Amino acid sequence: MKKIITSFPNLLLSILLCFVLSSCSSTGVKMSDSSPWKTIQFQDQANALDVDFIDNNNGFLVGSNRLIMESNDGGETWEKRNLDLPSEENFRLIDIDFKGQEGWLIGQPSLVMHTLDAGKNWTRLSLGNKLPGQPYLITTVDDGVAELATTAGAIYQTSDSGESWNAKVLDASGSGGVRDLRRTDKGDYVSVSSLGNFFSTLENDSNSWIAHQRASSKRVQSIGFNPEGSLWMLSRGAEIRFNEDTNDLENWSKPIIPILNGYNYLDMGWDPNGDIWAGGGNGTLIVSKDQGKTWNKYPIAAELPTNYIKIVFLDKEALDNQKGFVLGERGYILKWNS
């Protein structure tokens, strides 16, 4: 009798486990023999946070500890540059964006810089002390026109190269603060609240954020747009989801869990072939060539002592071929060579 009573809780646990697994899609991961990525390691141990190119050869990479580097050979090699900033100020340079020779660079705390000559000279702009939150995302819209988004969900636009800024959002509280924020070329935004308990959207012609419930009890890690404009979501527990109806942002696919290694995915990106890449902690970099049904893992990426925090594929008119980078911590990045 005691044996029967002891085994009954185990039976319940097994049934519960089967139920949980049936609600997920666990694809398994194969190891690829070759990789389209080239490893680049900087002597500086700072974390790379963003990269952008002006043309096929000239580009800039920015990161923590005031890191700014320039490439003149398409990203094969990089040289460290210095900004005219007080030595006692330690900025996290988090975003950089160019359109032609004009570019914008933002950092934390409260840094916005502007260039008109492809990064040869940078001018620091004053934001005053009334800006809600810290700069998070900068987009070069047109000549002298840029949009600045902050960690508070506020969005400002300048039409005079940063001399003045006008608010585009009447009430930023609907975003719940920001832990992740993305923008489409059309000017639509999506953000994850600071606690990851919901996400919000902002259409280009709207001045208010709309909050949406997350897809499950798991907190949202990051969210973004695929090339067609649909949303994807990365949640705690290494879960990947895709929105199945752009008119219904509560309608999400079952969670896809390619690897159960205890590390979360931090970003996703689509390469020129339409393959989906996901990167995360402990050197995790995986790819799906069939829209998320199956996934492959790359050994070169897994061998590096880093977390992959951002995946960037640059597709702009100034570039003959799309460029790709995976940005990691501790001075590691990967460059797309396919």
From Swiss-Prot:
Pfam families documented for this protein: PSII_BNR (PF14870)
Lipidated residues (N-palmitoyl cysteine): 24
InterPro entries from the UniProt entry: PSII_CF48-like_dom (IPR028203), WD40/YVTN_repeat-like_dom_sf (IPR015943), Ycf48/Hcf136 (IPR016705)
UniProtKB keywords: Lipoprotein, Membrane, Palmitate, Photosynthesis, Photosystem II, Signal, Thylakoid
Subcellular location: Cellular thylakoid membrane
Signal peptide: 1-23
Entry's Gene Ontology cellular component terms: photosystem II; plasma membrane-derived thylakoid membrane; thylakoid lumen
BP GO terms, sorted: photosynthesis
Topology in membrane: Lipid-anchor
PROSITE patterns: PROKAR_LIPOPROTEIN (PS51257)
Gene3D superfamilies, per the entry: YVTN repeat-like/Quinoprotein amine dehydrogenase
Origin: domain of life: Bacteria
S-diacylglycerol cysteine lipid attachment residues: 24
Family classification: Belongs to the Ycf48 family.
Domain notes: A 7-bladed beta-propeller torus, about 55 by 55 Angstroms, with a depth of about 25 Angstroms and a central pore.
Role, per record: A factor required for optimal assembly of photosystem II (PSII), acting in the early stages of PSII assembly. Also plays a role in replacement of photodamaged D1 (psbA). Assists YidC in synthesis of chlorophyll-binding proteins.
Subunit structure: Part of early PSII assembly complexes which includes D1 (psbA) and PsbI; not found in mature PSII. Binds to the lumenal side of PSII complexes. Interacts with YidC.
HAMAP family recorded: Ycf48
Protein name: Photosystem II assembly lipoprotein Ycf48
Designated gene of the protein: ycf48
